[in-house]
Amino acid sequence: MIVKVCGITIAEDALASVAAGASVLGFNFYPKSPRYVRPEAARVIADQVSVLRVGVFVNEAPGDVVRIMKIAGMDVAQVYLGALPAGVRTWRARNVDATFDAAELSDPAPEAFLLDAPAPGVHGGTGHMFDWSRVPSVPRKIVLAGGLDASNVARAIAIAKPWGVDACSKLETAPGRKDHKRVRDFIEAAMAVHV
């Protein structure tokens, strides 16, 4: 089980998340996000950790995704909307809304799919949940996101049986600032589940 703490904006939160057991950190490169971090600032943080570093992109041109990933020192591009860039590891992020079709998960291009809760005009970090029973049983890596925290992650894992889980806003005191106790509690709860 991988555990991703997303919306990292400062080194203190990155280091605390890794110390608590996070195996993946997410950095948001969508300028309209309250958790947006400049690629150069993300690089300073990313260079201090040895876990998987995922850059979050929304409808960004593939060439720009690759350029930002190099500047920021990211390992994987998590892409909401738009084309997947070639030559880099990718996760396709998809909101599980009324238009969600499990057949989309057969696309061989991304190495994983991140399934998130829908919210009009917002891409991740909303704190909203979706019906976890809608996550299909497929032979693909699925990362479950959307309103997860220590109080519900075990139930979400039991229902959806994902490869990984991702949390952001439910671990914060303010957008982009993590509550380290909430981070620890979330990671402990996720890692305690055996599926």
Describe every region a protein language model picked out.
Residues 1-195:
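Conserved N-terminal beta1-alpha1 strand-loop-helix module at the mouth
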